[in-house]
Regions:
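Divalent metal-dependent catalytic cores for phosphoryl transfer on phosphate-bearing substrates
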Residues: 81-106, 233, 246-247, 253, ...
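A cross-family structural signal marking well-folded subdomains
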Residues: 317-431, 439, 608, 612-624
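Conserved nucleotidyltransferase catalytic core and NTase-mimicking acidic/glycine-rich helix/loop elements
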Residues: 4, 10, 21, 170-321, ...
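Regulatory modules associated with amino-acid/nitrogen control
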Residues: 251-252, 292-343, 415, 423, ...
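Active-site flanking loop/helix segments enriched in acidic
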Residues: 34-47, 194-204, 343-347, 400-405, ...
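N-terminal regions immediately upstream of nucleotidyltransferase
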Residues: 1-68, 86, 193
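Conserved catalytic core of two-metal-ion nucleotidyltransferases
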Residues: 48-56, 62-64, 101-157, 254, ...
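Alpha-helical phosphate/pyrophosphate-handling elements in metalloenzyme active cores
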Residues: 50-73, 218-233, 240, 447-489, ...
Length: 624
C-alpha cells in the first residue's frame, strides 16, 4: 500500500462485518507503515478520526440518528482525540429519558458490532442528571467528563451536560486538585514510588503519561481550558516547561504506540519480551541488549524529568494559584534559605550562583527534620542552574566539604539523599553516577535500574540507625552504632555498582573510582583503602554464603583470609544485607539472612581466636 499523509480509503458501502473488518485491516496496515514517516501525535489523532467516522457511520446504519434525544459522546483519551493502536474507546450515550425497547435493541446491536470488530469499547448509557451525580461521586468519571467530545446526536443534550460539568458546584478547583493528587499518590504507591522498575508501565508508573495528564487536568479544570498549551498564558508553566513536557510526552507516546503494535493489544507494560522489538521499531537498532539499553535509558531519563515537573507544577498550582501557602509560617534558616511550611525555599533567585549553596540546601534538609521537600520556586531555580553547570560540583572545594558533611550527618541518608537523587544532584556531583542513571540490568535478580537499586541500598543502610527499625536487623543496628565512620559504609553503597554498564569487572572499576574519590575528598589512606576494598569485594560475602559450605572450617578460613579483619567484616556484612534486599522485593528471605548471619558469626569467631591478620597499627593511629 502506498504511503500517504493521511488514510484516504472510503468507508465500506455495505455495512457488513466482513467489509468493516477489511477496512480496519487496511487502516491498521497504514498506521503501522506511517509510524516510520509521521509523528506519533499525528497518528493517534488519525486513529481517533478514523474511529469517529466508523462510529458515526454505524450509528446511522442502526438508525440511532433518528432519535433526537440521544448523544454519542467520546470521553477520556478518546474524548481528547488521542487513540493509540489498541487503546480503549470510551463512550457515553447520553439520553434525556429512559430508553424504549427499540432504542435498547439498536444500541445493543451497535455495541455488539463494535465488539465483533475487536474494538476495546467501554460504554455507559446515562442521563445528564445521572452523569452529573456519578461524576460528583467518582473522580475518574468526573475527569472523563471534563474531556468529552460530541461525535453525533443531540448537541442540546451535550451542551447541557458540558454546562453542568464546568460549574464550580460539580467539583471545586481545590477539591478536584486534592482528589487528583490523592489518586496519583495511591497510584505511585502501587509502584513503590519509583519509575525505575525494569518492566515499567508507560501510563501508570511515576513519571509516566498519567503524570503528564494530571499536570494538565488540575489546571484545565481551574482555568476551563482544553489544551496544555493554553496554560502557558495563565503562568501555570513556562514556555520551556511546556516544550519539555511535550518532548517527554512524544517519546512516551512513541514507546506506547510501538508497544501496542508489537503486542497486538492494549498493553502498557513494556515487558522484557517486547523490549527488543520495540527498540528496533523506534530506531535504536537490532543489536539485542545494547539497543534495549539505549531505549530504556532514554525512557528512565524521560520519566525522571516528568516526575520532577509533576512535583514542581502541582506544588506551584496548590501554593501559588490556589493560594494554599499564603498563611504558612516562614522561618529563616540562614542568609540563603528559609523554611516555608515544611518546604525549603531560596531567599534569592541568584542563590545558586554560588555552587556550594546547592549542597548547602541538602545539608539543611538533612539537618532539619521538619523539611519534607523543596519549594516549587526553588526547584525551578535548581533546574535552571543544573543545565548551566560547567564541570562537576565535586570540582569545587566548598562543595566537597559540604558533600562529606552530608555523608557524615546522622540523617544524611534520609530525605536528603533521596532528593539529591530525584533532582539529579548526585549526577551533577559525581560524573560516574551520570553513567548509571537509567542503566538497565539484564539478569534474573535485579528489578530496578542501577541508580535506583543503589538509592535503595542507601535507604537500607540508613534503616540500621533509624529510630523504629532497631528490631529489623538488630545485629546490623548494633554494628552501625559502634562504627566510628558510618560514612564509609554509605560511600561504599554509592560506589558498589557505579561502574556497571562500562564493560569489564564493575567491582574492580568501581574500586578505582572509589580510590579517586577518596583522594579528591582527602580521606585518610586507611579510609580510602577500606572504601576501595568494600567496593571491590561487595559480592564476596553473598557468593560465599550462598554457594559455599559455610560450615566447612576451610571455607571460613579462606573467607577470613580475604576479609583480613573484623572491621572489614562489619562493614561488608552491613553492605551485603542492604545490597541483596535492594535488588528485588521478592529476593530476600530468612534463609539468606540466616546464611549471612552464620557466615558473619563464624568468621568473627575465627578472628577472635587469632586468625585475624595483623594490621599496621602505626598507620591506623597516625591517620585517626
Amino acid at each position: 500500500m502506498n504511503m500517504a499523509l493521511a488514510f484516504n480509503k472510503s468507508l465500506p458501502g455495505l455495512c457488513t462485518l466482513d467489509s468493516y473488518k477489511k477496512h480496519f485491516v487496511e487502516f491498521n496496515d497504514w498506521l503501522k507503515n506511517a509510524f516510520e514517516h509521521q509523528t506519533v501525535g499525528s497518528l493517534v489523532k488519525a486513529r481517533a478520526r478514523f474511529i469517529d467516522e466508523v462510529l458515526v457511520s454505524l450509528w446511522q446504519h442502526f438508525d440511532l440518528h433518528k432519535h433526537k434525544k440521544i448523544s454519542l459522546i467520546a470521553v477520556g483519551g478518546y474524548g481528547r482525540g488521542e487513540l493509540h493502536p489498541c487503546s480503549d474507546i470510551d463512550l457515553l450515550l447520553l439520553t434525556d429519558s429512559k430508553l424504549d425497547a427499540q432504542q435498547k435493541e439498536q444500541i445493543s446491536q451497535f455495541i455488539t458490532l463494535l465488539w465483533d470488530l475487536r474494538l476495546e469499547v467501554g460504554h455507559s448509557v446515562r442521563s445528564v442528571k445521572e452523569s452529573v451525580t456519578l461524576g460528583k461521586e467518582d473522580i475518574t468519571i468526573a475527569t472523563n467528563l471534563m474531556e468529552m467530545r460530541l461525535l453525533t446526536g443531540s448537541k442540546e443534550l451535550f451542551d447541557e451536560l458540558q454546562l453542568q460539568v464546568c460549574k464550580n458546584s460539580f467539583w471545586t478547583s481545590q477539591a478536584f486538585f486534592q482528589a487528583k493528587r490523592d489518586e496519583q499518590q495511591q497510584r505511585h504507591a502501587q509502584y513503590h514510588g519509583t519509575a525505575y522498575n525494569l518492566e515499567p508501565n508507560l501510563k501508570a508508573n511515576p513519571g509516566g503519561l498519567r503524570d503528564i495528564q494530571t499536570i494538565g487536568w488540575v489546571a484545565k479544570k481551574h482555568f476551563n481550558t482544553r489544551t496544555m498549551r493554553e496554560l502557558v498564558a495563565y503562568q501555570y508553566l513556562t514556555e520551556d516547561e511546556y516544550q519539555e513536557l511535550m518532548e517527554c510526552e512524544a517519546y512516551l507516546w512513541q514507546m506506547r504506540f510501538a508497544l501496542h503494535v508489537e503486542s497486538g493489544r492494549n498493553e502498557n507494560r513494556i515487558l522484557f519480551d517486547y523490549q527488543p522489538a520495540v527498540a528496533k521499531r523506534l530506531g535504536f537498532g537490532d543489536d539485542g541488549k545494547a539497543s534495549v539499553e539505549r531505549m530504556m535509558k532514554r525512557f528512565f531519563q524521560t520519566v525522571q524529568r516528568v516526575a520532577e515537573l509533576n512535583d514542581m507544577l502541582l506544588q506551584h498550582f496548590d501554593g501559588s494559584i490556589l493560594n494554599s501557602q499564603s498563611k504558612l509560617k516562614q522561618q529563616k534558616l540562614d542568609d540563603f534559605f528559609e523554611l516555608t511550611g515544611h518546604l525549603i525555599r531560596a531567599t534569592d533567585n541568584a542563590v545558586f550562583a554560588r555552587r556550594e549553596n546547592i549542597l548547602r540546601m541538602f545539608w539543611h534538609i538533612a539537618n532539619n527534620s521538619n523539611i519534607t521537600g523543596i519549594h516549587s520556586d526553588t526547584i525551578r531555580l535548581l533546574r535552571l542552574v543544573r543545565r548551566r553547570l560547567m564541570g562537576d560540583l565535586q570540582d569545587y572545594e566548598a562543595c566537597r566539604q559540604l558533600f562529606m558533611t552530608i555523608m557524615r550527618h546522622p540523617r544524611g541518608m534520609d530525605r536528603a539523599i533521596t532528593l539529591m537523587h530525584r533532582h539529579g544532584i548526585l549526577a551533577s556531583y559525581l560524573p560516574a553516577w551520570r553513567n548509571i542513571v537509567g542503566q538497565m540490568q539484564f539478569d534474573l535478580f535485579h528489578a530496578y535500574t542501577v541508580d535506583e537499586h543503589t538509592h535503595r541500598v542507601l535507604k537500607n543502610l540508613y534503616r540500621y540507625s533509624q529510630a523504629g527499625f532497631e528490631n529489623e536487623f538488630p545485629l546490623c543496628t548494633d554494628i552501625v552504632k559502634r562504627m566510628e565512620k558510618p560514612e564509609i559504609l554509605y560511600l561504599a553503597g554509592i560506589f558498589h555498582d557505579i561502574a556497571k554498564g562500562r564493560g569489564g569487572d564493575h567491582s574492580e572499576l568501581g574500586s578505582l573510582d572509589a580510590r579517586e574519590f577518596g583522594k579528591l575528598h582527602k580521606l585518610s589512606d586507611f579510609d580510602s583503602k577500606l572504601l576501595a576494598w568494600l567496593v571491590e569485594s561487595h559480592l564476596l560475602m553473598s557468593v560465599t554464603a550462598q554457594r559455599r559450605d559455610i560450615h566447612d572450617p576451610a571455607v571460613i578460613a579462606e573467607f577470613a583470609d580475604k576479609v583480613r579483619d573484623e572491621t572489614r567484616l562489619n562493614y561488608l556484612y552491613c553492605l551485603t544485607l542492604a545490597d541483596i534486599r535492594a535488588t528485588n522485593d521478592n529476593l530476600w528471605n530468612d534463609w539468606k539472612g540466616s546464611l549471612l548471619r552464620e557466615l558473619y558469626l563464624g568468621t568473627q569467631k575465627a578472628f577472635r581466636r587469632g586468625l585475624e591478620k595483623p594490621m599496621d597499627l602505626r598507620d591506623l593511629i597516625r591517620e585517626n
